[in-house]
UniProtKB/Swiss-Prot annotation:
Organism field: Corynebacterium jeikeium (strain K411)
Enzyme Commission (EC) number: 2.7.1.23
Keyword Metal-binding: no
UniProt-recorded name of the protein: NAD kinase
Entry's family note: Belongs to the NAD kinase family.
Catalysed transformations (reactions): NAD(+) + ATP = ADP + NADP(+) + H(+)
Amino acid sequence: MTTPGTDHNADQGADSGDKATKAASGAQTEREVLLVAHTGVHENLGLAAEAASRLQKGGINVRVMATADPAPVARHEVLGRFKRFGHTKEAATGVEMVIVLGGDGTFLRAADIAHSADVPVLGINMGHIGFLAEWEQESLQEAVDRVIDRDYRIEDRMTLSITARDMDGRVLGTGWALNECSVENLNRQGVLDTILEVDERPVSSFGCDGVLVSTPTGSTAYAFSAGGPVLWPELDAILVVTSNAHTLFSRPLVVSPNSMVAVETNPSTSPATVVMDGFRQIHMPPGARVEIRRGPQPVRWVRLDSAPFTDRLVHKFRLPVTGWRGPRH
């Protein structure tokens, strides 16, 4: 999320005079990126090889990480020549950025690595909607050239910090999320009895299939499908959306980013699970609770596109705007 003072240029605040001085003195450090590709799609291998070769020709060393089966990468005549890593923090440690070729699922897994190493992440869409991606595969070459030329900027996106506790207050697990944290019922034959809490005060109790707590970035994902509003990414807020709640009060809530949201389950209800960004999980026995706060560390988001979020929303969801005439001055 963009906040005052958090935007950087690609040289982390260095002005043109500083860059000229560094270039003249030969003091520039060696550049390296981590390239993450969804290898489950054959076409992605060729595009990843194209990107890796172009980055290397541009003077940037490349590491490669496969989110699915690593074997196709190892066997590939081009990608097999680069250093290969698994899903570990070390894969992104010390790199300039993580470049992701894939859909939103691949992006979220790569963001997990980038966040752990505190390095920026750039998404290039190879999926369908790909709302988290900054660029489309048709312009892959341009995106790579922009990285080589350091023609990008970085903005911070808000995250969530999650702690699950049992009935006695013991910590069951911790985690974080870029998109959302969902509390989901494990018993598909009944409802999950919960009570929603904001800033240590009860809001409402209800039976439901689950509760979603989302960032503005995640408001276009699972929360949107559950009937939540779209929040502009520049907004600092926490979004709460219930899933099939059995209550008259089931409207989405938008609360302060400084608030703590908690979802507590009834001791006699079903077990549940906390799912973060669709793939990190914490088991919740009956009577457990999950506490969600603003995360202390944002995700550093690489921006290439200068178009406003409104245009992005219209394009990604193919919203009809026929007949719009614009403001009159």
